[in-house]
Structure formats: C-alpha cells, structure tokens
C-alpha cells in the first residue's frame, strides 16, 4: 500500500507539474458545489440524503474538441453511522459512527461524446466521461482502532453533462465515484470479537466515496456558437 501511495503521489506531483498547462495554456478555470457521500461498513449503497457539503476548484486544458485534462482540488465532509440506518441487526449493537474532512488532489482526462465546442458544432451540450488518479487526505476526531495512513490513493471515475451558456461561460452537473484501496474511511474494518468494544466490519470490501455537484467554468478562449445559433 505504501508503494501504491508513493507511486500515485509521484505521478500527481511530478507528472502534474510536467504536464500542467502554463498560464497561456490554461483554457478554462472553474469551481463546483455539491456533496460528498460514502458507502462502506456503516452505509451500503449511494444515498442522496447522506450527502454533506463539498466543493471543488479546477483548471482545464483542452487537447482537442473532445478530450480535456482536468486538474482539481476537492474537499468536503464525509459522515455516516449505524444509528441512522443500520445495515443489519448487529449494526444496532455496534453503534459506530464517523465524521471526517476529505481533501483530494486529482488529475483526470475528460472525453466529451458530442462536438459542442467547435465552430461547426450542432449542439450546445455534451455528456462526458472522466477518469484518472487521485490522492486524498482524511482528518477526523475519532481514535484509530489500529494504525493506518491518513493519505490514500483513489481511482476517480465520473459522468457528467456540460452546457455552453455563452461564448465564455459553461455550466455542468457531475456524479463521480472514488474507488479506494482502503477499508478505513469509516474507521471500521476487521475486528476481534474476543476484544472488548471491538468494531467489526468487512475488510474484504474497500470503502468508496462519491462527489455529486454542479459546476461553473470560465473559458479564456472564445467558445464558438454552435452552428444553429450563428
């Protein structure tokens, strides 16, 4: 695990510095507001009402009309507990909960399925898919049941939709999942039932967290009006 974290950190730092666009090459800048939620030992599956406040700031370099590179910082709150919606009868007795702050650095490649930026585009919108690598840190007040790193790698995958408002501004909506290599996001993993106050969990099933939000970005270049709007 330490090797994985070190490798992804090197890619994000050195690879990001080497490929991050200069000021003249930054095509778009923007931010997003939304929520973070998670699934793991305390909460199973995505639940919209479990979302806690989150935000993201990003810059984007457009390689061509369909492919872009996005460099982002995302942060927010994650929480969950057995008391809210116990996953099984044993969870009632366990009565575990957590609340942490997440800060994530990511590099993602976006692919837009429709041509909506070129001068010959026939539409103002496009769905898109994004994937890449990320490194996140987590901080909370709960005592760790056993030592584990507060910095972890992740594989972010997202689906979204963008819409061109005018030649300089674009809005979007995105749903993203972070596939993790750790089962300690909720501070619950394996446990020894012979130990007092043990916290059991499924250590064969890693935790996952999600970002759902709306984005607004500004283009330093002029987005051509789609053909029907000329």
Predicted segments, located by residue:
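Residues that define the transmembrane beta-barrel architecture of outer-membrane proteins
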Residues: 49-53, 101-105, 125, 147-155, ...
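Residues on the lipid-exposed face of transmembrane beta-strands in outer-membrane beta-barrel proteins
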Residues: 31-33, 57-61, 107-111, 131-135, ...
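Repeated loop/turn-to-beta-strand initiation elements of outer-membrane beta-barrel proteins
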Residues: 27, 66-69, 117, 167-171, ...
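Extracellular loop and loop/strand-boundary signature of outer-membrane beta-barrel proteins
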Residues: 39-45, 90-98, 142-147, 199-202
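Short glycine/proline- and aromatic-enriched beta-strand/turn motifs that initiate or cap beta-hairpins
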Residues: 22-62, 211-226
